[in-house]
Amino acid sequence: MGGRVSKAVACCCCRSQHHGVVVESSEKTAEEDHGESYELPAFQEFSFEQLRLATSGFAVENIVSEHGEKAPNVVYKGKLDAQRRIAVKRFNRSAWPDPRQFLEEAKSVGQLRSKRLANLLGCCCEGDERLLVAEYMPNDTLAKHLFHWEAQAMKWPMRLRVVLYLAEALEYCTSKGRALYHDLNAYRVLFDDDCNPRLSCFGLMKNSRDGKSYSTNLAFTPPEYMRTGRITPESVIYSFGTLLLDVLSGKHIPPSHALDLIRDRNFNMLTDSCLEGQFSNEEGTELVRLASRCLHYEPRERPNVRSLVQALAPLQKDLETPSYELMDIPRGGATSVQSLLLSPLAEACSRKDLTAIHEILEKTGYKDDEGTANELSFQMWTNQMQDTLNSKKKGDNAFRQKDFSSAIDCYSQFIEVGTMVSPTIYARRCLSYLMNDKAEQALSDAMQALVISPTWPTAFYLQAAALLSLGMENEAQEAIKDGCAHETSSSSGH
């Protein structure tokens, strides 16, 4: 009866409570298997200003972490120089009081490079600010795909792939001297552009002084951690066992309850009903047996990561099918710009038609500024403010007359005073720079407009035009798609 676990598993589980299993190691190292030929830039230290700009001023719209703004440490999505997508974790100010310890830990984790990890690209340590920068994974978490799916449940071959890749990630980290992973759970497993599962690098870093390695419900923490408050490599294996249960059941079942179900041979409660007919008794038996070994009360009786990999590898199915097909998700943002219904401005920017862009910006005026360029408090009415307004008016007139060099000068005067903030001014100066073949300055202005207004489609479209001028077509298409997504969301009232 496929999709149900046979009663024979009870015998396996009972035996595993008393006997460890010795597995011969394979000849290949974890690095050769999972880290080879994976090229990324070297770890670097970023300035706070770089990351502020990359995340549009740490905009709420860019938060991707589970609990949003309420989380003690918030994760944002962003783009470095409008090119590489990144995830930025901003720590609570009290999380890392010792800047030297933070830098040492970050640099150590930043040496890891594997296609099984969402790798750490860099960090920032300025004043009280502590931030980590990692590869951005666009296709959600394992928790989302297992517990909160919408269209369809994750297929059995994909579930097997997830746990194998996760075991390989842990094996690679262990081979590099980073065997400890803090609070391993379904939210730590992310999916990349190709929908391949990756282990978040953030769990590899922990401030030893804060005394907490598990933020989840205590029902899921290893028993030895409850006794000693310390995490060991065997504790990570225990957490891996809870993930095996998640994958098998499609639910977040407390380990003690799961072990009771196994002892009582109540396997129907342990397996996801959505998997009916997708796997054999033998496959289910092996996964439950492996989970029960990982959840052994005695840490020394749990398997090591290499034996996990060797146990899971033979179970793999549909090896030639890409993960994005198993998940029924378009590959790497596979939606082409050509297939999108583009607004006139998006169309003009996608063709880098600067004349058409100018006409649209001139016609739109300052409608998108929501009054930021016009609402002045009483105390602002000074001679300096009058000069500022005059520079704006002169800039607008030059922009209208297509005297783009003068427009740049006048808008720059307005921006330098800094008493008013206008995304439209940056948009107009951006186009003026493009008209003068200054694409890098144009890109900077488009990004600054996004800092002021993080969901403004015009800023994304102008960013695309600047990227096209720099010969960065793929990045330009991503910017167009981002702008279209925000424009669609705005028009639908979300």
UniProtKB/Swiss-Prot annotation:
Q: Matching PROSITE patterns, A to Z?
A: PROTEIN_KINASE_DOM
Q: Where is the Protein kinase domain?
A: 61-316
Q: Which GO terms describe its molecular function?
A: ATP binding; protein serine kinase activity; protein serine/threonine kinase activity
What does UniProt list as catalytic?
D183
Pinpoint the residue ranges of every TPR repeat in the record: 423-456
**What does UniProt give as GO cellular component?**
plasma membrane
**Which InterPro entries does this one have?**
BSK, Kinase-like_dom_sf, Prot_kinase_dom, Ser-Thr/Tyr_kinase_cat_dom, TPR-like_helical_dom_sf
Subunit text: Interacts with BRI1 and BSL1.
Question: What phylogenetic lineage does the species belong to?
Answer: Eukaryota, Viridiplantae, Streptophyta, Embryophyta, Tracheophyta
Specify the protein's topology with respect to the membrane.
Lipid-anchor
Name the lipidated positions (N-myristoyl glycine). Answer: G2
According to the UniProt record, list the residues that bear Phosphoserine. Answer: S213, S215
Indicate the secretion signal residues.
none
From the UniProt record, list the reaction(s) this protein catalyses. L-seryl-[protein] + ATP = O-phospho-L-seryl-[protein] + ADP + H(+); L-threonyl-[protein] + ATP = O-phospho-L-threonyl-[protein] + ADP + H(+)
Gene Ontology biological process = brassinosteroid mediated signaling pathway; positive regulation of brassinosteroid mediated signaling pathway
- Keyword field: ATP-binding, Cell membrane, Kinase, Lipoprotein, Membrane, Myristate, Nucleotide-binding, Phosphoprotein, Serine/threonine-protein kinase, TPR repeat, Transferase
Per the UniProt entry, the effect of S215A is:
Loss of its function in the regulation of brassinosteroid signaling
What does the PTM comment of the record read? Phosphorylated at Ser-213 and Ser-215 by BRI1. Phosphorylation at Ser-215 is required for its function in the regulation of brassinosteroid signaling. Phosphorylation by BRI1 disrupts the interaction between its TPR and kinase domains, thereby increasing the binding between its kinase domain and BSL1.
Give the domain of life. Eukaryota
Q: Where in the cell is it found?
A: Cell membrane
Q: What induces it?
A: Induced by 24-epibrassinolide in roots and leaves.
What residues does ATP bind to? H67, G68, E69, K70, A71, P72, N73, V74, V75, K89
User: Broadest EC class?
Assistant: transferase
Keyword Cell membrane among record annotations: yes
Name of the protein: Probable serine/threonine-protein kinase BSK3
> From what organism does this protein derive?
Oryza sativa subsp. japonica (Rice)
Question: Does the record bear Repeat in its keywords?
Answer: no
